[in-house]
Structure formats: structure tokens, C-alpha cells
């Protein structure tokens, strides 16, 4: 069977925090991965769970795959653009605030 993927780009999440959760489900069966993500108390877990559910729906709808046989083939989180903001400081100065984004890629297959 071919592999099916889902992508979410520009997520307001740092890469390190996303990779921490992605490492938990890499190579696992889909139902086990969803269970892990449901009980992981991280913001990244909610985001990655939505992408995984999208990949499962894509596999079922587009390829007619059996959900019970699907595994998380690959999952990786890459760095996106960093939003740069400024905050006011004393004596007319300003400090930069970096708001990192990332891209989440999930591939499921047999």
C-alpha cells in the first residue's frame, strides 16, 4: 500500500517542543499513537494529534486503507519562520521577542 501524508505549516510552536512529542509516536500503530497523544499533557500533543487524524482520514478516504493496519511511518517537525516582535523597555529602549513557528509532517502506511 502507498503511504499517505498530512502536513500542517506555520504552527505557533517551537521545534524542540514539537519534536519532543513526535518522538513518542514514531513507528507506533495508529491507535496506540492516538492513545499516547490523548494522554500527553503538552500543547504539541493536541496539534500533532490533529495532523495524525488528518493523515488517517486521508488514507481511509483517498487510498481505502484499513485503519487497524496503519502505522506512523514518518513524523518530523521542521523549523518555520520566526515572527519577530518588540516589547517596550525602560528609557525608550526595546527588546526583541522571537515567536517561533514550525511545520509538522506525518506519513502513515502499512
UniProtKB/Swiss-Prot annotation:
Cellular-component GO terms for this entry: cytosolic large ribosomal subunit
Gene: rplV
Keyword Transcription: no
UniProt-recorded Gene Ontology molecular function terms: rRNA binding; structural constituent of ribosome
Coiled coil stretches, renumbered: none
Family annotation (InterPro entries): Ribosomal_uL22 (IPR001063), Ribosomal_uL22_bac/chlpt-type (IPR005727), Ribosomal_uL22_bac/org-type (IPR047867), Ribosomal_uL22_CS (IPR018260), Ribosomal_uL22_sf (IPR036394)
Entry protein name: Large ribosomal subunit protein uL22
Subunit structure, as described in the record: Part of the 50S ribosomal subunit.
CDD domains in the cross-refs: Ribosomal_L22
GO annotation, biological process: translation
Function field: This protein binds specifically to 23S rRNA; its binding is stimulated by other ribosomal proteins, e.g. L4, L17, and L20. It is important during the early stages of 50S assembly. It makes multiple contacts with different domains of the 23S rRNA in the assembled 50S subunit and ribosome.
Keyword set, alphabetical order: Ribonucleoprotein, Ribosomal protein, RNA-binding, rRNA-binding
UniProt lineage: Bacteria, Pseudomonadati, Pseudomonadota, Betaproteobacteria, Burkholderiales
Domain of life of the native organism: Bacteria
Pfam families, per the entry: Ribosomal_L22
Family: Belongs to the universal ribosomal protein uL22 family.
